[in-house]
Amino acid sequence: MRKRISAIIMTLFMVLVSCNSGGVAEDPQSKFLKSVIDLGNDFLNVFTSFGDIVSKVLGFSTETKKSDVGAYFKTIQDTIQGTKDKLNKIVTDMKREGNPNASATETAVKTLIDNTLDKIIEGAKTVSDAIGDASDPIANVAAQNAAGAAGTEVDKLVKGIKTIVDVVLKGVGSANAGDDKKAEDGNTARTAAAGDGEAGKLFTAGAGAAGDANNAKKVAADAAKAVGAVTGADILQAMIKDNGDAAKLATAQNAGAAPKDGAIAGGIALRVMAKGGKFAGPSAAADDAVTAIKGAAISAITKALDTLTIAIRKTIDAGLKTVKEAMKINANDTPISPEQNTPKATTNN
C-alpha cells in the first residue's frame, strides 16, 4: 500500500512540474543542469567529428593521385577548423548561461587553439595548397629512357609538414634513422652522388637514371630496404629537417654524404607528394623494378601519413581533456538528455 501511495505522489509531482513548465520560469538550478548536459553533448560531438579522420583509412594505391594526398590535408584542415569552431561555441554558450567555469574553459580553449589547432590548420593548408589539383599518380615513375622530375613547391611541402610535426611529434622519430648500407649486400655504403644500384638514383636527373633492368631492380630493392628500415615518425622528421638530405634528394640535389635510410624514405615521400614529381625510370625494359619502385613509394607515404594522423588525434585528445577538466564535466561519460534524468513513477500490482 505504501509503495502505491509513493507512486501516486511521484506521478502527481511530475504532472505538477509539467504544468508549471509552460507558464513559470525555469528553475535556475534545473537550467544549469540542462546546460551541463548540453555542454556534455557538444563536447562529445567534438570528439566524434575529429574521430572521423582516423576512421578513414588511407587506402593509397598505384591509382591514387597526388591531389588525393592534397585532399587528405584539406580534410585535416577542415576537421580541425570544425573542432575549433565547436570549442568556441561551447565557450560562448557557457558565458551566455553564466556558467561558473566559463572563464577557466575559455583559457583552456584559447591555449589549445593558439598552441595546437591553429598551427595544424596552417600546416595542413600549406601542404594542400602546394599539391593543388595535381592529377598525376603518387607512384609516378618515368617511362623507359625518360627523365624523372623534382616537381614544384617542395619547400612549401616541407614547411607545412614541419608546422604540424613540430606540434604533434616533437622529439619523436629521427631524421638519421637507419644506416647508409645498400640493400645489395648490406655492408657497402651508399654514395653521396648515388652510384649504380642505389636508391638515390631515383632522384637523379637524366633519362633512364635508374639504369638497366639489373641495376633498376637493385635500385628498387634499396628503396624498399630504406623505407622498411624506418618508422613513419622517422620519415616525417627526415622530411622536415632543415637543409636535410631528404629535401636535397627530393629536389635532385647531391645529398653531400651517403644518405641513410631515413633520408631516402623521406625523399621518396616528398617526391610522392610534389606536384609534377616523378621518379627516374630505367634505361631498359624493367617492369618488375618499376612495380617495386611504386610499392616503395606507396609504402613511404602511407607510413608517414598514418603516423601523422594518429599523432594529430592523440595531440587533440590530450588538449580536449584539458578543456574537459576546465569545464568540470566527464567527457568519458555518454551525455544524456534531460528526459533521461527524469524519475519515473512505478506501480506495484
Swiss-Prot record:
Stored PROSITE patterns: PROKAR_LIPOPROTEIN
Lipid-modified sites (S-diacylglycerol cysteine): C19
Transmembrane feature ranges: none
InterPro entries, per database record: Borrelia_lipo (IPR000680)
Keywords recorded for this protein, A-Z: Cell outer membrane, Lipoprotein, Membrane, Palmitate, Plasmid, Signal
Subcellular location: Cell outer membrane
Domain of life assignment: Bacteria
Lipid-attached positions, N-palmitoyl cysteine: C19
Note: Genes for both Vlp and Vsp families are on (usually) unnamed linear plasmids in B.hermsii HS1.
Protein name, UniProt field: Variable large protein 19
